Amino acid sequence: MTVASQSIEEFKECLYHMQETRKLLTMQLLATGKITSAEIQILKRTLEEMQDERTTDFYIRHIHSRGATFAINIRDEILGLKKDFLFLENFASECESEESFTNRLKLCDLPGLLSNNQIDIRLMNGFAEEVAKCKEFLMDLITIESDGIKPLFITDWDGTMKDYCSQYATNLQPAYSAIVMGVFARNFTRAFAVLTAGPLRHPGILDLTSLPIDGPVMFSGSWGREWWLGGRRVVHDDGIPEEGSVAIGQLYEQLEEILHEGEFVQFALVGSGVQKKVDRLTLGVQTVFGQVPKELSAKYIDAVKERIHRVDPNSQYLILENCSPLEIEVCVHSSGAIWNKGDGVAALVEFNKDSLKLGKVCVAGDTTSDLPMLQKAAQENPTQVRALFVNVNKEIQSTINKIVGDSSRTCFISCPDVAHAAFAQIIIELTQNA
């Protein structure tokens, strides 16, 4: 029996075309507060395509390229589209009768929609309680003290403001998330910055977000080594030798070649895919569901090693690191200290001519790699630092409470949608009569 499949090129083109519409809708809503039903139909068509006969009941979609057929899990893509279409359809309907953006948002009941569409029944049952807790935390954050200074909000992306996705290349932010993030950032913070480990482009956070890249939220990649600020890319390459930067660029071109060979083509969609960062390449070698045959994964890693040897035959500039069973990294030998997200925060503050010592500072994250951001903020502003962390275990919670020094200034939630729902409630409550 022949299994129906879609080409990798068609799959990505379908989703990327839809994402451009999401970006336009978000920009339009942030500017005018209005959309029409006709403008959101591409989301409906994309959702229908993602759920056609090429996708099983368990979100497994069959993809082909150059004679090879493989399966990928598109649960995040489908669930994001479902929630987005429901929200935007309701919002467009309210635009026909309601005059204010706030009333439209209120009548759409985004918190209720998100609660009813959680994949985990445990999240669904406790969703409203978590949203109330998160809202209280955020209301305290944005309450302006006598100094009149709005807070600074610095956040990780994947797992914190955006659900994890099996394919980094199609880890696309829904419009509902972008809209409430954008309005919250614009109205209640002096700066709202995303600091992610992934790259800015090809693909990167600037391609995957639905927010306008020169809008109310700032974006960085490579642990804050590269920022999109003032309409341009600002790079902090301290400690990275020029020869190493050249070598990593050459290796990226080499890997682009082997990903166009039939045998390894699926690795463009496996986990991290191929991410070119300032000082390294991150390569996905296995999915979280173990869908790649072990022999093929090992063969791909060998091919990567062979290309490293071509570019750097004497191992002067590049080093291969096995990060996890899911990905490997090829890093540039650095002559300086190891860069972390705390350094990225310092780079942002310096560029903006801001200070962590001013006002309240909230750091949001979901893993230990986000702790350096919190530590940096706590060192500079120990009495006003706050932490919002997503789906972390008790041990990490304890570490966070120790860094902050006051559990009343920490908040732990189960998923990014809790924060989105809390943003929506605050926008409605504080702008109702504005």
From Swiss-Prot:
Coiled coil: none
Keywords associated with the record: Hydrolase, Magnesium, Metal-binding
Highest taxon of the lineage: Eukaryota
UniProt key word rRNA-binding: no
Active site (UniProt): D158
Residues that hold substrate according to the record: Q275, K276, K277
Group of enzyme by EC: hydrolase
Cofactor(s) in the UniProt record: Mg(2+)
GO molecular function, one term: trehalose-phosphatase activity
Annotated catalysed reactions: alpha,alpha-trehalose 6-phosphate + H2O = alpha,alpha-trehalose + phosphate
Cofactor: binding comment: Binds 1 Mg(2+) ion per subunit.
Function: Catalyzes the hydrolysis of trehalose 6-phosphate to trehalose and phosphate; prevents the accumulation of toxic levels of trehalose 6-phosphate.
Stated family: Belongs to the gob-1 trehalose phosphatase family.
Descriptive protein name: Trehalose-phosphatase
Organism: Caenorhabditis briggsae
Phylogenetic placement of the source organism: Eukaryota, Metazoa, Ecdysozoa, Nematoda, Chromadorea
